[in-house]
């Protein structure tokens, strides 16, 4: 006849082993879930917002700043982009501009509103800046202020639409949203802001 005490000890040991296994399984699954969450967060969709600089002044001829209409458009751009994400307190993470006054003055109201610096890029090497943005800002929102000839080129460099229509010399109201998912096809959306362009 078996000793009742030994059966109880065996049952207790078995229960402890089961409990230990359950805890180990929970810890392993939690670690896997945390790793997967980190992976998917680090691979999140990158959004690049491209705009052409706002309306430029006629003087000085060399490197004009913005006209009054351009300053109003830049202020409207800032108003729209301050809360670019639906999550409160989340918006544009970085702002890039060429070194031309009209581009910097277009970017400044957004930079001031978000307390971000305006980072300069070389207008003659659009491929380098688009590569750098994709590498450095994965899962972020970036504003890039360019020119009528560089915006379509940079959008194409991102692997997005190569069919962006030519931007007219008097056309300043386009916002191009390029979304680069960690998996899937890069998309381009064109929106309008400020006073509409009338051809």
Language-model segments: which ranges?
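Conserved alpha/beta-hydrolase "nucleophile elbow" surrounding the catalytic nucleophile
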Residues: 147
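Active-site-proximal alpha-helix that buttresses catalytic centers in soluble enzyme cores
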Residues: 2-39, 43-137, 150-199
């Amino acid at each position: 006849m078996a000793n009742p005490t030994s059966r109880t000890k065996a049952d207790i040991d078995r229960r402890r082993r089961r409990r230990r296994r359950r805890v180990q399984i929970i810890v392993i699954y939690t670690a896997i879930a945390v790793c997967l969450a980190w992976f998917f967060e680090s691979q999140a969709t990158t959004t690049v917002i491209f705009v052409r600089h706002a309306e430029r002044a006629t003087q000085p001829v060399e490197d004009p700043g913005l006209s009054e209409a351009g300053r109003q458009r830049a202020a409207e751009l800032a108003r729209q982009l301050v809360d670019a994400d639906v999550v409160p307190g989340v918006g544009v993470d970085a702002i890039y501009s060429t070194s031309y006054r009209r581009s910097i003055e277009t970017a400044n109201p957004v930079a001031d509103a978000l307390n971000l610096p305006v980072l300069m890029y070389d207008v003659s090497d659009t491929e380098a800046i688009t590569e750098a943005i994709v590498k450095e800002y994965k899962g972020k929102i970036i504003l890039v202020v360019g020119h009528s000839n560089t915006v379509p080129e940079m959008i194409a460099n991102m692997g997005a639409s190569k069919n962006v229509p030519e931007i007219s010399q008097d056309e300043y109201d386009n916002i191009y949203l390029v979304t680069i998912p960690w998996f899937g096809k890069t998309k381009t959306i064109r929106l309008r802001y400020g006073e509409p362009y009338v051809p």
